[in-house]
Amino acid sequence: MDLAAYWDSLPWQQRDLGGWTADSLAEGLAAFVAARHIAARQPAALRSLDILPGRAKDGSPEAHTLHLVPGEVVCIVGPTGSGKSRLLADIECLAQGDTPSRRRVLVDGSAPDPQWRFSGEARLVAQITQNMNFVMDLAVADFLHLHAESRALEDADEAVRRVLDAAVAMAGEPFGADTPLTQLSGGQSRALMIADAALLSPKPVVLIDEIENAGVDRGRALNLFVEKGKIVLLSTHDPLLALSGHRRLVIRNGAVARVIEASPAERECAQRLARFDRSLAGLREALRRGEPLDEAWSRLRF
């Protein structure tokens, strides 16, 4: 059915109340399609993100300027209430000295375009929080198809398959394309959104809040973002995750108190922790399967 036939098939009440004519509908559709293709050809190409120092909670000046580049993972550590979430919020809104911390965020060395701050579609930052639940009554595949089609991807089916495969690989419990979104567990929801943000979203900056509480494979999640060239900032209390980044920011009293570059010695510590973590994950899976603890323990290396 072409557009003219579709227009003629509508009840006169719907045509009248909509405020459209056949010509204006055709013009609006053409403009929408053109805008979709422009957005698909011109993704946000970010070269760097700079975070200029602001002030601590007591008003004292912050000491560190941060320079972030695509493919970099930066971990944010500090006690609860130290200001980790404030830093993430400043980056999310590309703060320009208009937040309590007085920080400024520069995009490619310059102040950001206002639409990158205030337009939902044009914003450069995606955030994955601790609590994520779906309210749409759709199957997983239908939801992913909607997102893929909105990005004007040439092969939406292939994009959906890649996102679903990545999400299932990260989740503790498998789920399928026909699973309703509202029936996903917290970990499954988080895995789906991580895969979606990495593989479908054009946002070049991703903020993640305490992924260790998500019930997902943390290593797979981080690797997915790095492979796609995202700038990743990760707030965490997990020692393995804290050692998995290129550097980590120590937050104290609302300010960046220290920047620690990952050293070879820390890389070795991370490898040891990773082996321990894999053994612990195996023990966890054995308990889920109902195996006796002593049998599982004898097979694992601690």
Q: Which role does the model predict for each range below?
A:
Residues 74-76, 88:
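Short hydrophobic beta-strand immediately N-terminal to the Walker A/P-loop
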Residues 88-150:
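ABC ATPase nucleotide-binding domain signature region
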Residues 243-251:
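Conserved catalytic segment of ABC-fold P-loop ATPases
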Residues 178-184:
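Conserved ABC ATPase signature
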